[in-house]
């Protein structure tokens, strides 16, 4: 490595293959990659917005509700709009994970050491697959089982069960974020430990 003196204040250490670029060049690259990723997420959101009602209806149909769809209640139309757009955002982010991961990798690659590259590549790949698996697991298997268990535990004679659609969605979404953040944090720590 050689020492490069930039001005009279800053001193950097560069590897032989490194190039000294001004901070503005890095900022321009970051803005360009963020712009591309944002446009991609917005396009995915537009696509998901066209089918979100059908997807939510299909998901609600998979839930083991006591007496079927007649037990679903919508207490606030504005909350339902928020729910729909939250679902669109979640689906857009999930379907954009490969592009977001690729953009992060391409931006970070030149500045990383080989061990850091291995860690980041593994984290992006395993984290992306883990994220998709956890979301499918929570929404498709875990949440319906929780509703079944709750129905068995709370049966009061003469009292009908009614479910707030927005509350069901918000609870599934909260579980998703909680388990996802814990899983990604554990993955980051495990990879840091394994790869040094």
Protein language model features and the residues they cover:
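Membrane topogenic/interface segments and analogous intrinsically disordered interaction regions
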Residues: 1-196
């Amino acid at each position: 490595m050689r020492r490069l003196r930039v001005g009279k204040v800053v001193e950097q250490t560069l590897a032989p293959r490194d190039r000294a670029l001004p901070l503005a060049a890095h900022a321009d690259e970051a803005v360009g990659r963020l712009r591309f990723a944002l446009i991609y997420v917005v396009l995915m959101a537009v696509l998901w917005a066209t089918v979100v009602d059908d997807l939510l209806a299909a998901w609600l149909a998979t839930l083991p509700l006591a007496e079927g769809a007649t037990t679903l209640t919508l207490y606030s139309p504005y909350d339902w709009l928020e729910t729909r757009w939250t679902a669109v955002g979640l689906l857009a982010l999930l379907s954009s994970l490969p592009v977001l991961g690729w953009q992060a990798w391409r931006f970070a690659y030149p500045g990383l050491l080989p061990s850091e590259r291995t860690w980041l590549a593994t984290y992006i790949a395993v984290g992306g697959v883990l994220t998709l698996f956890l979301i499918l697991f929570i929404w498709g298997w875990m949440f319906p089982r929780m509703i079944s268990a709750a129905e068995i535990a709370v049966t009061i004679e003469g009292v009908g069960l009614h479910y707030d659609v927005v509350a069901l969605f918000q609870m599934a979404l909260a579980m998703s974020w909680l388990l996802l953040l814990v899983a990604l944090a554990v993955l980051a720590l495990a990879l840091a430990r394994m790869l040094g």
